[in-house]
Amino acid sequence: MTTGRKVMVLGLDGMEPYTAKRLMDAGKMPNLKKMVENGAARENLELLGSMPTITPAQWTTLACGCNPGVHGITDFWNQDPENLDTIIYGLDSRLCQAEQLWNVTARAGLKTLVWQWPGSSWPPSSDSENLMVVDGTQPASVNYSIANIDIEKYVEASTEITENEFIDHIGSKNLGDAATDCVIDELDLEEESDEDKYAEFDASKTDAKANRAELLLNRYKMKRIKNVDFHKQGGAAMEQLAKVPFDKIKSTISEPTKWAKELPEGAREFITYTAGGQMRRPCLILKNADGIYDTVEVYRSKKDAEPLCTIVGEEMVTDVLDENLDHGKKTMATRSYKVLEIAPDGSKVRMWMSTAFKVDCDDRWSPKSIYKEVIENCGYVPPFTQMGGTTLEFAQKILTPSWEHNAMWQSRAINYLIKEKDLDVVFSHHHFIDHSAHQFWNFALQKPGMAPEEEYQKQIDKTYEVADEYIGSYLHLLDEGWTIILTSDHGEQIHTMPPARLGSAGGASAGIMRELGYTVMKKDENGNDTAEVDFSKTKALAVRTSYIWINTKGRDKYGSRQVRSRRTDHRRSLQIS
């Protein structure tokens, strides 16, 4: 091993010891085995965590060395100090009340990089020239909450489809032929910025279906939320996350017309859309030398001589640079494409288009100059997918491969900065195990109507094999005087039945607490419960994932209860009146 001063904290969110050890012992994680054999670890690779086992709270504990009750990042959302039913975004370093270790190392003269560390890294809490910070305002991936300007899309093209159809991800709004004719050359739309739009989010004032989609897709942009979850069917959070909406495109396959260039014999065409259905992109289906259709080319327009990208077979094509719209203004963005199916006779194509990430996006890189260096030397920040939970094919062909690409890009970027900036300390985090777990782990125990559980079990193993590849990309540092600390924050559970939901990741929970009589909702004119808490009758409210607050007089804005405390046999009991 090493005796040098250089240290890397290699964080893998959601990586749990039992699966890791099982696969290591089976020879499927050789890089992890190399670390264990040449370093130090508990026999079963177990880690010591703190409560609650929530990403931002745990990673802040790792950064500060104290529990959430001390450092103050207590969940994805912190409690609003003024209103019990309101929560404020918790992944904000300004909420952290303890000193992060990276500020200590930077102050000590060590060149330090903090990369996508969720909970307490952004904005930078030190102005030291030795400190570099990249994002960390959400756990998913670098730039995710600010660069994604066009949601991912699932394209079905067929000779049997007679009309082009764009189906919006939120409202299932069918734009039909209007979308086909709406090719945008110049657009001047006045839209409020995300910063203004999501400053306050009151779910009780929005359509229920739209509200669910907004929370799911844009929760990392919201600063303050007032939302009540009733858990009517006791659904599991993992199953909700597995059903992330996406745009769906239906397109007719036909003989190509009005192309400026000469096309190969037998070429066919279809249309896909970008920019929320406001820009169309013509596509060609081409034969190989054997006369089998196996290639799709995507073009900006039929006037172009060269395609935006060429997809052969089922390969994933990344870093596809194209125009898109950001609040109505044209901007350059990058996305990935993958053909899921192409009929040998060219009569059918199924294709995935990833989220589009705008390229001009250095807002959460400090100093900003390192963003340009990274994309010039390591490639554009790669989007990932929110699809893949309930559909095994998506998990196998899209989710795991896109995360593998994202992870290895991150490795290239961090290794580049280590070398070029002569770094001494790195705090890094990657989220692909946790995200994959939320998408499909729960189907590794057979669920009605789902693919065989064994297939999902194989996909879990594949995810950990990608993790091992990612770990291995840093092991060269051991020969260069580095110490690597591999760590995680929590594991994941698999349920045979949906668990009882006492908490809510996105607001207050009125399910069990309402049944027990502790939480009372205001009534509408028909005597039905609304989504607003009646604090004059509410004794206590479950808020966020892990907390119950007593509606206390003298402390809370609408406090209605007196609380008395007494100790008996070293236990404390509360009397609420």
Whereabouts are the PLM-identified features?
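Nucleic acid-processing catalytic cores of prokaryotic defense/repair systems
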Residues: 49-52, 57-63, 71, 75-79
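Active-site-proximal, well-structured secondary-structure segments within enzyme catalytic domains
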Residues: 369-400, 430-458
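A long, amphipathic alpha-helix that forms part
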Residues: 400-421, 425-426, 442-484, 494, ...
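Positions that flank functional sites
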Residues: 51, 119-121, 433
